[in-house]
């Protein structure tokens, strides 16, 4: 679903996610279903992780091109797109947390994230401790060994623009660390380079950038992204190929816009 690269992010933004057709513009594949060679092949596809040409809730070539581009930009092994930024946030939390688990989260965060952590998470028995993200030590101090599954931060935060010490966050051992890097974009920072487990974007905003795509995306190591993908096909917050095409077009202009 992606590969690490050593190119400058601005160059990657222009070239990442291109297919083999030679087209400079993102290609659109609106298909929802693909044929197979037989029943055995269908069974194999249904069990495969992120099978591109099976069923669009599992994967889609246009969406996959966008995912490849984000993985390259974030310098991670893989990426996974969702129907929105909140689709990404809720899928990460619900894929990795169960009743009785604990989350440490930044207090000054996006209103939708705050509502999700205070609402559905509480109803599902997932406890959340909120900390001041401007003091990175508070994240580590709030971790409960063996119980805290996620440490969640935004940098810069929306809308207060609070910054988080990414090195300190990446150094936390035990829980999976998540940084919403929407307002920075990969051209401003790459949290995974500091040891953060998952980088998250509401790509509707800076990445897509043209007000014509609603889409979210996460990036991280292959195994972790694959685990979240397994939940995402049940959660159903699948990215549209039309939005992925527009978002990938937006990524091409990212450096010029910033």
Where does each model-flagged region fall?
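N-terminal glycine-rich, Lys/His-bearing helix-loop that initiates the first secondary-structure elements
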Residues: 1-50
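Conserved PLP-enzyme active-site core in the AAT-like
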Residues: 2-4, 10-19, 78-258
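Conserved N-terminal alpha-helix of the aminotransferase class I/II PLP-enzyme fold
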Residues: 36-87, 112-119
